[in-house]
Each structure stands twice: as structure tokens, then as C-alpha cells.
């Protein structure tokens, strides 16, 4: 109860602050102004008239994890409508025209009012959140409406707030997920230790996406000029542990 009270106070006061910061930051401006159009987009798509499957991702990297699932789902259930939401402008601005989704918009700020309005607009039959996305008011709203929530390509570490003694309020969110599809055995073990057993280890769906991209034609003139026929290895979004392997 205390966690939710503190969380909701922070959520309510933080968005007006972000609007002010947005006057001086292009990215934050996209973040706030983009959200001001969310309900207009939802209304134009008549999301209350069909049963929708909702995928939510934070940014571009998480989108790449969700993309193989969205495409596969659409191929198997072509009559179902796909709603895709983004948290960050770096994902939305690049992928807002993704053809396999029937409606694409920003995730509204996680206030109780926004959550209720969003779920009133959207006739969602199931929700799929990718990797690190756990939003207290959205999870509570989905639970109250008996809409199942799945967590895909999620990954957990002992250092995360969920597993700290002072993170008990945030930890409760984990019990609102119907099934976890996690990236590794450690994530499964951490969830199992909390009594959460609806967990499958499926790896990182981004591997599937990278494999698909490798099979495509990816020639770029600028890269051909840069490499001059010499083999070139490109790494991006790497972690320190990756650097040892690369070197």
C-alpha cells in the first residue's frame, strides 16, 4: 500500500516536470508530446470494436525482440488485431509504420486515470510485455479486468529491485504475470525462489531476429567503400563482458 502511494505521487508529479524539461530537450519533447496524441490515435482505430492483442516494448532493441513474435502471431491469427506500444521515442519514431501492427502509439504515462482510460478504449484480450517492462498501474488494471499478462524475453538479476529486501512492493508485480518466457536459467531460478513456477527458458528472441537479418541482402555502398574488400566485424550495444570475446 505504501509502495503504491509513493509510486503514484512520483508518477503524478514527474510528467509535468518532463514537459518543462522537454522545452530544452528534443528527445523529451517527443516523449511528452507523442503521448498527448495517444488517445486520439486509439480513438481513430476503434480499438473497442475488436479483440486486440497488445504488445508493449520499451524501445528499438525490445522491438526487435518482439518483432518475430508479432509476425508469427499475425500469420497464425490473421483476423486478430495487433496493438503495439512504445515507451521511448527512439523506438516509436523509427517503427511507427511497422506493417504487422494495426495500431502503434506511445504507452500512456502510468497514472491510474490514464490506465483506466487506455483499457476502456482498448478491448484487449491479452497483453505481452517485453524484457524489463513492469508498470504497476497497468499491471493492476489488467489484473482487475482479468486480462492475462505474459512477459517475454525477460531477464532477471539478483541486484534488481525485485529481489532486494526493500523492493517488496515492486516484487508483488511479478505475481501478476501468467507466464514468463525468460532468457536464461538464472532468471528462472530467481523467479522460482519467489514461488513463481510458470516460467520457461526460451532464450533471447532477438537471436531469431538477427538470424533473419543475416539471411537478407544487407549490402551498403558506404560499407563496401569503408572495408575495401577486407573482412569487417561490427559490434553494437555491447556489454563489457562482450569486449573480452571481441578482442
Label each residue range with its predicted role:
Residues 241-247:
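Catalytic cores of alpha/beta
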Residues 3-21, 25:
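Membrane-interacting alpha-helical segments
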Residues 13, 55, 246:
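A residue-level signal for conserved active-site and pocket-lining positions in enzyme catalytic cores
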Residues 19-216, 234, 238-240:
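Active-site and donor-binding regions of nucleotide-sugar-utilizing enzymes
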Amino acid at each position: 500500500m505504501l509502495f503504491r502511494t509513493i509510486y503514484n505521487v512520483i508518477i503524478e508529479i514527474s510528467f509535468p516536470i518532463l514537459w518543462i524539461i522537454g522545452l530544452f530537450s528534443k528527445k523529451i519533447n517527443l516523449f511528452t508530446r507523442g503521448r498527448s496524441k495517444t488517445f486520439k490515435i486509439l480513438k481513430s482505430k476503434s480499438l473497442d470494436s475488436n479483440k486486440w492483442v497488445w504488445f508493449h516494448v520499451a524501445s528499438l532493441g525490445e522491438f526487435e525482440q518482439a518483432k518475430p513474435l508479432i509476425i508469427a502471431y499475425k500469420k497464425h491469427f490473421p483476423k486478430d488485431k495487433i496493438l503495439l506500444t512504445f515507451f521511448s521515442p527512439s523506438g516509436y519514431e523509427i517503427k511507427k509504420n511497422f506493417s504487422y501492427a494495426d495500431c502503434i502509439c506511445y504507452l500512456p504515462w502510468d497514472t491510474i486515470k490514464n490506465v483506466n482510460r487506455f483499457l476502456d478504449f482498448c478491448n484487449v484480450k491479452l497483453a505481452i510485455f517485453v524484457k524489463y517492462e513492469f508498470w504497476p498501474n497497468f499491471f493492476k488494471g489488467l489484473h482487475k479486468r482479468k486480462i492475462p499478462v505474459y512477459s517475454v524475453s525477460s531477464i532477471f538479476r539478483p541486484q534488481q529491485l525485485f529481489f532486494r529486501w526493500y523492493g517488496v512492493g515492486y516484487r508483488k508485480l511479478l505475481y501478476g504475470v501468467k507466464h514468463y518466457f525468460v532468457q536464461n536459467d538464472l532468471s528462472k531460478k530467481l523467479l522460482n525462489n519467489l514461488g513463481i513456477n510458470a516460467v520457461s527458458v526460451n532464450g533471447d528472441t532477438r537471436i531469431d531476429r538477427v538470424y533473419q537479418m543475416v539471411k537478407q541482402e544487407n549490402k551498403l555502398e558506404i560499407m563496401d567503400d569503408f572495408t575495401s574488400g577486407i573482412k569487417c566485424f561490427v559490434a553494437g550495444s555491447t556489454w563489457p563482458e562482450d569486449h573480452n570475446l571481441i578482442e
